[in-house]
UniProtKB/Swiss-Prot annotation:
This is UPF0102 protein Dhaf_3740. Disulfide bonds: none annotated. GO terms for molecular function: nucleic acid binding. The lineage of its organism: Bacteria, Bacillati, Bacillota, Clostridia, Eubacteriales. It holds the Pfam family UPF0102. It comes from Desulfitobacterium hafniense (strain DSM 10664 / DCB-2). CDD domains: PoNe_Nuclease. PANTHER family: UPF0102 PROTEIN YRAN.
Length: 121
């Protein structure tokens, strides 16, 4: 992955964390890594644990972030979430939700990135 894409991804994740906190959620973990992959953000809203994938794009040439979640990717996110819950020794599984936050950074002077939060992917 190019340095530019890595920087764009980090920027998008930072924006997403700010957005999540402003919405009143508690961020439990960022960039949770396990042998199965990585979960960008794990948050909590009330009794619900939310696993959040962040997709940041500067152009739509390869499709926007919200268009890029495949069934295979969702399945991987579910497996990572299962690992997280087992690793954190949850005795009973809490209510779970999987969300996507798509960030569109279109390099228009003075324009803030668009943040699209899709709950329950």
């Amino acid at each position: 992955m190019s340095e530019h894409r890595q920087a764009l991804g980090r920027y998008g994740e930072e924006l997403a964390v700010k957005h999540i906190r402003q919405a009143g959620l508690t961020v439990l973990e960022c960039n949770y890594r396990c042998p199965l992959g990585e979960m960008d953000i794990i948050a909590q809203e009330g009794e619900t644990i939310i696993f959040i994938e962040v997709r940041t794009r500067s152009t739509g040439s390869r499709g926007w972030g919200e268009e890029s979640i495949t069934a295979k990717k969702r399945e991987r996110l579910y497996r990572i979430a299962t690992h997280y819950l087992k690793f954190r020794n949850y005795k009973e599984w809490p209510s779970l939700r999987f969300d996507l936050i798509a960030i569109r950074c279109q390099n228009q002077e003075g324009k803030q990135p668009d943040i699209i939060w899709i709950r329950g992917i």
